[in-house]
C-alpha cells in the first residue's frame, strides 16, 4: 500500500523525467512513516540542520537508502529530483529557501493539523499559503482543516503488515 502511495505522490509532482530511483531531499519528521517511504527503493537525503529534529534511532533504525547528510551541509552535488517537506511548522520554510537555488519540484506533505485556538490566526493564514507544486494530506479531515485554497491530494497513511 505504501509503495503505491509514494508512486501517487511522484506522479503528482510531474517530475520532468521518469526514473526508477529518485533522489529526494527532506528533513527527519516521522521515523515510522519515513521508514515505510524508504521501502519504495528511492534514495532519501535528510538534512541535518541545527535546531531541527534529528532521526530518533530508538524509534526505528535508519533505512539503508535513507541518508543523513553531514551537519549543515546541503550536498547539492547530489542533484536531487525533488524536495519533500513534511511540516509547515518550520520545515517548509527551510526547504522553500533551499529550493530558491535548487529550483526543483516541491512536494508539501502535511501530517499535522493547524492549531486553531492555540496559534494566532495570522500564523495559520501564513501556513495556509505554504503550498508546493504538489500538496498532500494524510486524511480528508486534514485537507479540509488546512483549507489551502489550491488543488491538493489525500494519501492515507499505510500500515506495513510484513
Regions found by a protein language model. Give the residues of each.
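Residues at the starts of beta-strands that form the adenosine-phosphate
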Residues: 23, 43, 105, 134, ...
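Extended catalytic core of nucleotide-activated donor transferases of GT-like folds
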Residues: 30-33, 45-132, 140-144
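A generic structural signal for short, solvent-exposed coil/turn residues
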Residues: 16-18, 100, 146
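N-terminal subdomain of nucleotide-sugar transferases
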Residues: 1-55
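A broadly tuned "polar low-complexity/structure-edge" signature
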Residues: 6, 87-88, 161-162
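Histidine-centered active-site/metal-ligand motif
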Residues: 42, 111, 157
Amino acid at each position: 500500500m505504501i509503495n503505491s502511495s509514494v508512486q501517487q505522490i511522484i506522479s503528482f509532482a510531474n517530475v520532468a523525467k521518469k526514473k526508477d530511483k529518485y533522489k529526494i531531499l527532506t528533513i527527519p519528521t516521522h521515523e515510522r512513516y519515513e521508514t515505510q517511504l524508504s521501502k519504495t527503493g528511492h534514495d532519501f537525503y535528510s538534512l541535518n540542520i541545527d535546531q531541527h529534529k534529528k532521526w530518533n534511532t530508538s524509534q526505528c533504525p535508519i533505512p539503508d537508502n535513507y541518508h543523513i547528510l553531514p551537519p549543515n551541509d546541503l550536498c547539492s552535488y547530489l542533484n536531487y529530483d525533488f524536495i519533500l517537506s513534511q511540516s509547515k511548522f518550520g520545515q517548509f520554510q527551510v526547504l522553500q529557501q533551499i529550493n530558491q537555488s535548487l529550483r526543483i519540484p516541491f512536494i508539501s506533505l502535511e501530517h499535522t493539523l493547524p492549531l486553531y485556538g492555540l496559534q494566532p490566526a495570522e500564523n495559520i493564514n501564513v501556513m495556509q499559503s505554504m503550498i508546493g507544486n504538489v500538496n498532500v494530506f494524510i486524511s480528508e479531515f486534514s485537507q479540509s482543516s488546512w483549507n489551502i485554497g489550491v488543488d491538493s491530494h489525500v494519501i492515507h497513511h499505510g500500515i506495513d503488515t510484513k
